[in-house]
Design a protein with these regions (language model features):
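Two-component/phosphorelay signaling modules centered on CheY-like receiver
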Residues: 11-31
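Acidic, metal-coordinating helix/loop segments flanking the phosphotransfer/catalytic sites
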Residues: 32-50
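Acidic catalytic/metal-coordinating carboxylates
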Residues: 34-35, 61-64
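Receiver (REC) domain active-site loop signature in two-component systems and cognate sites
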Residues: 57
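C-terminal output helix
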Residues: 88, 106-115
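C-terminal output/effector regions of signal-responsive regulators
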Residues: 130-174
Length: 174
């Protein structure tokens, strides 16, 4: 049985995401925390296989929380959730040891896939076995997530341009 700590100040997300784990091929117990401080106390008292944390919470930000977690438990994969990911944020998160960065809104299948891979990878490392999760598969996931983020950004830009064209056409006709 695997144990995951889910941290977010959004109570709706804390209630919704544990249901996603019921679809996992692994048996996963989920603990929740609504603040980074509460999570750090739980991490000291409980052995987790993976930690999933919102990036933007009151108190510690995602990078500060990541540093504290890695100092306490360097072997635990940490997945950050963010609603406003930038390339700069991603680079900093990976530099500090994040396993993955997932964009909100969360796709349940992608989320479950990333968490399950993190759990399996940790278990294999603990058993001293090689990791079949090649960098290529991880890179493919990263590319897919970045593609979704960029597609969303392009849709937003397209919508803004359409509104500006529509406004300009109205101005010309007046």
């Amino acid at each position: 049985m695997s144990r995951v700590l889910l941290i977010d100040d959004d109570q709706h997300l804390l209630m919704a995401l544990p249901a996603v784990f019921a679809r996992s091929p692994c048996v996963i117990t989920v603990d929740t925390a609504s603040s980074a401080e509460q999570a750090l106390r739980l991490i000291q008292a409980t052995q987790y296989d993976t930690i999933v944390s919102d990036f933007s919470m009151p108190g510690l930000n995602g990078i500060e929380f990541l540093k504290e977690c890695k100092a306490a438990r360097p072997d635990i994969p940490i997945i950050l959730l963010t609603g406003y990911g930038t390339l700069e944020l991603e680079e900093k998160a990976f530099e500090e040891g994040a396993y993955a960065l997932i964009q909100k809104p969360i796709d349940a299948d992608d989320f479950l896939s990333v968490v399950t891979r993190a759990i399996i990878r940790r278990e294999l490392r603990q058993a001293g076995l090689s990791d079949p999760m090649s960098p290529i598969s991880i890179d493919a996931h990263t590319i897919r997530m970045e593609s979704k983020r960029l597609s969303s950004r392009l849709r937003d830009i397209d919508e803004r341009l359409r509104r500006q064209i529509k406004d300009a056409d109205k101005d010309r006709s007046n």
